[in-house]
């Protein structure tokens, strides 16, 4: 029996990261030729932010050299799992990844990508990362409308980014779990990536104990967060900061990895 006609969003792509479930409509065009989005990059170039992925893998290897096996990386705002897959693959036999994604449909793709790439050292969690555990309501975008879904902000504010469609923060919302990283009581954390669309400071507050005890390397998207507050929070905890594209790389002053970095632009 023939099924109903329906538009397909998620497809399988043979990418440089492996076989990936990706939304072919995950893009926002800024002109006739240029656009952005995780899906856009993968389908146009076979890769997503390869330089950033390479840097993260190198930093994980450095943590292994200085702290031994058992490296743990947290991918907060994991999207469909490019970083998660690459990290888990690189750390086979000596490290693991906890990937956290708030958008339900994207979380399904993340979990599928972990499975299809046989990353038995990676785990996915459907939640938003914040300052305290609980629940929150987040918007439900239309995944059939071309948009940069990874740019979706979970909280409404005066200058929310236009991702390719209007977002309603009061109707058709979904209640999801909200986690603070400290609630996991992890004995060791080596690396935390925060790409949570303006909730980076909240996520840091919820990881304060973990950061103070483990002094992990932090890679934080900075374009939607107050720079002065972010720099101050990290500096108070002994971190040295470097600008890496749209991200802020923070390495504790006592971390031997700091001496291995090539000269880079220090954060002001």
Language-model-detected regions and their locations in the chain:
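Glycine-rich adenosyl-binding loop in Rossmann-like folds that engage adenosine-containing cofactors
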Residues: 23-53, 120, 125-187, 261-264
């Amino acid at each position: 029996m023939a099924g109903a006609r329906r538009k397909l969003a998620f497809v399988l792509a043979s990418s440089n990261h492996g076989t990936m479930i990706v939304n072919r409509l995950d893009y926002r065009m800024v002109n006739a030729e240029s656009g952005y989005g995780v899906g856009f990059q993968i389908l146009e170039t076979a890769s997503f932010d390869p330089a950033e992925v390479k840097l993260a893998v190198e930093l994980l290897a450095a943590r292994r050299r200085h702290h031994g096996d058992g490296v743990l990386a947290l991918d907060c705002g994991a999207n469909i799992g490019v970083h998660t897959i690459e990290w888990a693959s690189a750390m086979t036999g000596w490290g693991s990844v906890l990937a956290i994604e708030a958008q339900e449909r994207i979380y399904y793709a993340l979990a599928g990508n972990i499975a299809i790439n046989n990353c038995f050292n990676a785990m996915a969690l459907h939640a938003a990362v914040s300052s305290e555990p609980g629940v929150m309501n987040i918007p439900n975008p239309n995944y059939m409308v071309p948009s940069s879904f990874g740019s979706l902000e979970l909280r409404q504010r005066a200058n929310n980014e236009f991702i390719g469609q209007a977002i309603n923060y009061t109707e058709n919302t979904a209640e999801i779990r909200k986690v603070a990283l400290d609630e996991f009581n992890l004995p060791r954390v080596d690396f935390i990536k925060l790409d949570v669309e303006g909730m980076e400071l909240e996520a840091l507050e919820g990881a304060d104990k973990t950061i103070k005890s483990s002094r992990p390397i932090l890679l934080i998207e900075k374009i939607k967060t107050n720079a002065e507050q972010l720099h101050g929070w990290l500096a108070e905890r002994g971190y040295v900061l470097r600008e890496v594209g749209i991200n802020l790389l923070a390495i504790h002053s006592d971390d031997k990895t700091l001496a291995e970095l090539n000269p880079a632009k220090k954060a002001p």
